[in-house]
Amino acid sequence: MKVDEREITVFQGEYKTSPLIVLNTVQGEGEEIHKITKELSASDFTLLSVQIDDWNSAMTPWRAEAAASWDSGYEGKADEYIKSLTQRIIPGVIVRYSLCPSFIAIAGYSLGGLFALYSMYRTDIFTRFASVSGSLWYPGFAEYTEKNIPSASPDRIYISLGNKEAKTGNRIM
């Protein structure tokens, strides 16, 4: 199904009240992640997988130069995507599938992890956040978190950092 030009896939939980987890994907890996997570966890949940084709644009909070020579730079259109996600995509899924989730979480990897944490400052729809190897090196993000108050009152936050960033010659990372 497409909403706001984005391909979304819903993997419905057993119950209408199952938590709703939003996962931004870049390579359509939602189905595989859902399958593996269901095998590893007894917890029931509904997964909303959103395909992000404009990754460097939709996942970044503001414009920034490329962090690597092979990268194209960052457009900084996260606020536009947050608006689409919170005003059209999530409400549309809740209505279409008659959901009443016990909570709504957002998870992401790399720039998606940055986006998950940034969204905590921009909307209160999410109460749980997972930033997996999040791009927390993003220029200005640490300062942003120090100067701003989250819109959400997080119930839980999971942050993991990769081990390759420390070994790179790139001073930004």
Label every model-predicted segment:
Residues T17-P19, N24-Q27, I94-Y97, M120-Y121, ...:
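Cell-envelope and extracellular/periplasmic
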Residues L136-M173:
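The feature captures the conserved acid-bearing segment of alpha/beta-hydrolase catalytic domains
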Residues K16-S18, D44, P101-F103, F126, ...:
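A general structural motif
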Residues Y81, S110-G113:
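Active-site loop->helix "elbow" adjoining a glycine-rich segment at hydrolase catalytic centers
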Residues G113-T123:
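Short glycine-enriched nucleophile-adjacent loop
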